[in-house]
Amino acid sequence: MKNLYKWPAAQSLYPNQGKKSYAGKRFRYRLRSWLHHSKIKQFEQFVTQNPQLIPLLNARPNYSYPVAHRFLDKRFSAKQRLQKITDNLLFLPQKLAHLPPLWEQAVNFGEIIADFELWLNINEHQPMEGFWALELRHRPTNQLVYLLTFGKLDEALLIAVIQGPNFEGSKELVKQLTKSCHGLRPAYLMVETMKALTAVLGYQSLLGIPQKYQNKSAGCKVSAM
C-alpha cells in the first residue's frame, strides 16, 4: 500500500534487464540487509513516525539502501550512518516546509548565466552520494550539465560529490559555460552556488569530503538524460 513503508525487496532495486542478470547485486543487497537487520528495523520505525517520507521512499527503493551500505562518507559506522540518514531526510523538507516536497516539484532558481539554469532537486542518480542536489542545466535542451550532491553533517552542510558531463558535445558546452563565467570553471561555480545556498538555509559552514572517502558511484559522470 502506498501509505505504508516496508524495507524494499532486492528485486525492486535490481530487476534483470533483458538478458542482463543482476543476481550478484541482489545477493549482496540481501546479505547487507541481513547484516544490518537491527538498523533496518530502527529505520522502519523512523519512517512510520515520519509518514510524509513514505511517498519518496516507496517510489525510490534505492533511497533506503544506504542504511545497509554507505552514505555520504565511507568512514561512518553503521550507527553514525543511520543517524545521518534520518537527519538528512528531514532537514531540507523542514527548511522548505512552505514549498511542495522536492520529490514532487524541484525548485527552479532560473538562469544564473545565459542559457544555464540552476535547480534544487532530489538526487536522481545515486542516493548514497546524498539525497539532495544542485543541478546546472542547459536551458535550450534541458540537459543536465553539472551535478552537486550534498547533505547535512551536524550543524554544517556537506558537499558529497561534484559530477561533470559525459555526453556528446559536452566538452564544447563546458567551454561555452566557462567562457560565460569569465574563466571560472563550472565545478567552482557549483561550489560558490552551494556556499550561497548554505547561507540562505541558515548554516554557517560548508564542508567537503576527502576524495578517498567519497561514495562516488562507478559511473559518476553525468550522462545524457
Curated annotation (Swiss-Prot):
Keyword match Cell membrane: yes
Pfam families xrefs: DUF535
UniProt-annotated location(s): Cell membrane
Highest rank taxon of the organism: Bacteria
Transmembrane regions: none
Keywords, alphabetical: Cell membrane, Membrane
A Gene Ontology BP annotation from the UniProt entry: DNA damage response
One GO CC term, this protein: plasma membrane
InterPro entries documented for this protein: DUF535
Family (UniProt): To H.influenzae HI_1119.
PANTHER family, per the entry: HOMOLOG OF VIRK
Protein name: Membrane protein LapB
Organism: Mannheimia haemolytica
